[in-house]
Amino acid sequence: MMSFVSLLLVGILFHATQAEQLTKCEVFQELKDLKDYGGVSLPEWVCTAFHTSGYDTQAIVQNNDSTEYGLFQINNKIWCKDDQNPHSRNICNISCDKFLDDDLTDDIMCVKKILDKVGINYWLAHKALCSEKLDQWLCEKL
């Protein structure tokens, strides 16, 4: 019985630390701290996150000379540091792998720095796909 409880506990803790693909309503709830920050509405953020990563907190995109991480696809040349790019400017002062978990606190802090420095156009999906007709990005459950 004790080994079953231990195994169950390990399974629960393992699951709790894993990154995940979030739902629209989970993203909507998690991003409340970004509401209207930099003049960007919450539905705009939900749309941008969807078109940037598909709500996947583990999303990694390798480019020719850089890599983008997490829900917001934060780049390792400027915003975070990893082994691939040890000379990053690391403006957010964080390891890129911190953007690959389901705790979005550090992601949101870095997103605010990106907004302050370069604005919402850092995310190409925003202008093309998320600047109008935003009703579909609301969460009806809340």
Curated annotation (Swiss-Prot):
GO terms for biological process: defense response to Gram-negative bacterium; defense response to Gram-positive bacterium; lactose biosynthetic process. Mammary gland specific. Secreted in milk. One of its GO terms (molecular function) is lysozyme activity. Keywords: Calcium, Disulfide bond, Glycoprotein, Lactose biosynthesis, Metal-binding, Milk protein, Secreted, Signal. Pfam families: Lys. Disulfide bonds join C25-C139, C47-C130, C80-C96, C92-C110. Ca(2+) binds at K98, D101, D103, D106, D107. SUPFAM superfamilies: Lysozyme-like. Residues 20-142 form the C-type lysozyme domain. Residues 1-19 form the signal peptide. One of its GO terms (cellular component) is extracellular region. It comes from the Eukaryota. InterPro entries: Glyco_hydro_22, Glyco_hydro_22_CS, Lactalbumin, Lysozyme-like_dom_sf. Belongs to the glycosyl hydrolase 22 family. Lactose synthase (LS) is a heterodimer of a catalytic component, beta1,4-galactosyltransferase (beta4Gal-T1) and a regulatory component, alpha-lactalbumin (LA). This is Alpha-lactalbumin. It comes from Ovis aries (Sheep). The gene is LALBA.
